Regions:
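Pseudouridine synthase
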Residues: 51, 158-221, 232
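A generic structural motif
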Residues: 108, 170, 224-226
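RNA pseudouridine synthases
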Residues: 1-166, 186, 204-206, 231, ...
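Residue-level detector of flexible, active-site-proximal loop/helix-junction positions
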Residues: 151, 197, 227
Length: 260
């Protein structure tokens, strides 16, 4: 199967692709689909659609301020502040590690039931403009927990069967591509990851399900509200394309409400 045979990883968006998850006077939280950039990027200068502009449309045309990153191929919870001061306070909380973030990922193989990945990462792993420059190496820590496993009778990479796991990921730091790079580091790359994954496994799922999305979804954030001081628990359910692929886990769909 050639690259030209693969379904397009970046769908065209019609209407506003964001789904509102939470709104108050100071914050707007949405579900971002896979394939949508959060904001303009010098690497993707040709792109014309961004979550930032769609969120602004949901905010009556008023400015919104993204307070954290979400990679283009990652779907899920994305939080905007509705004023600069709230953005500053919440941004500092993120930098201080005071925000709990949860993700779901489908990975190749069966990792241990739970574990901690404490593996420093370089600043710009895929930016060719920085390849000849010395890059700082920063501490990076991710906790993971295995939620479900499956084995399918499909021979990939020379094995008679192929194993996959659904895992919950909790990053304690926020390095670029941290979860994707950490799962690659422990030899359990995320399905659909064209930078750090396994090509043959990615091709199998793209061919089977008709899309080549990254199987990584931001599902929850817990933090102290930057204005009211209350504990805010935000949650975004995985979207249909993500849940479709999870059908290989059988009855996992029946427990959708219990997914972290």
């Amino acid at each position: 199967m050639s690259h030209s045979d693969l379904p397009a990883p970046c769908p065209a968006f019609y209407g506003n692709p964001l789904t509102e998850v939470y709104r108050d006077q100071w914050l707007l939280a949405v579900h971002k689909p896979a394939g949508l950039l959060v904001h303009r990027s010098p690497i993707d200068r040709h792109e014309t659609e961004f979550a930032l502009q769609y969120a602004r449309a949901m905010n009556a045309g008023e400015h919104v301020y993204p307070v954290h990153r979400l990679d283009r191929p990652t779907s899920g919870l994305l939080v905007f502040a509705r004023d600069p001061n709230t953005a500053s306070v919440l941004g500092k909380a993120l930098m201080a590690g005071a925000v709990q973030k949860s993700y779901l990922a489908m990975v190749r193989g069966w990792p241990q039931q739970e574990g901690v990945i404490n593996h420093p990462l370089r600043e710009h792993p895929t930016d060719r403009r920085c390849k000849d420059e010395p890059q700082p190496i920063r501490d990076a820590l991710t906790r993971y927990r295995r939620l479900a496993t499956t084995e399918i009778p499909v021979a990939i990479e020379g094995y008679p069967v192929s194993r996959y796991s659904l895992v919950a990921l909790h990053p304690a730091t926020g390095r670029k591509h941290q979860l994707r790079r950490h799962m690659q580091h422990i030899s359990h790359p995320i399905i659909g990851d064209t930078n750090y994954g396994r090509t043959k496994h990615n091709h199998y799922f793209a061919q089977t399900f008709g899309h080549s999305r990254l199987m990584l979804a931001a599902t929850a954030m817990v933090f102290t509200h930057p204005v009211t001081g209350t504990t805010l628990k935000l949650r975004a359910e995985p979207d249909a394309s993500f849940m479709q692929v999870l059908s290989i886990f059988g009855d996992i769909l029946a427990t959708r409400g219990s997914l972290p």
